[in-house]
């Protein structure tokens, strides 16, 4: 795919860390002076470049100082397999239109693997459970949370005919937090928990043969369990969970660019809210979940674009999570 003029300008500037004459840009790119001037104004407004007057000429410098991961103007976004994130479609579109980034998406099977990839700089951005991100921040300080997302779609489900007392859920995730809240509130009468890592290989093929009494899962896994005679006990949102996955960034991306990505993300969520169905087909192909289930998920998940520390404190308090103290995690939230 041919680069846009903005992308060509940014790529050219990346080769000249000390700056380049504005007059050299249109000559190098063989683009008209007026078009280059227009593009530079846009990039300057976005804070991606700075122009310094030297005599009767301008020297143009890139202000984007990021880790090696973004040198190719490519952002790597990690998500967990779910029907939760159709809103990444407008986010990806706006990252290209406004900041000149192509986006490559990697779909992970669980929260730990996806968040670990962010900490190790294998991805630059990740939509993973807030609880997982907070503990990763506590251990490494190498990520920052840029914005909210959606909540809902997950539930505690029960097989009343099961002869076991076991609970099954994903580890160190929103489901794990939901399980704990359900135990605290008396919805689950078992303390024996088993974890699955990959829902596609560990849960779906085996649920017919090993009957766990309780399973805590997200959409569309809830639909699959209903087909196998599991019933709803309580939704995770009714237990007080108001954030599932939130957007986090590696600290290899500098603060200024993180701020711009956060702003683009909020605009993307707003655009998504106006017509969620517009993005169903694209997202269905990405994650391999049928369009019908993605359409259903739109009513299952509710937007929660901004970070509300009060809601987060309330959930931690209700879950009786005191290690680490929530106050020590506030540095993870960069833009609220």
Positions of PLM-derived features:
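Short, Lys/Arg-rich nucleic-acid/phosphate-binding segment
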Residues: 52-67
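An extracytoplasmic/periplasmic, membrane-proximal ligand-sensing/linker region
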Residues: 61-63, 281-336
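Ligand-binding clefts/hinges and TM-proximal coupling segments of bilobed small-molecule sensing domains
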Residues: 175-198, 262-301
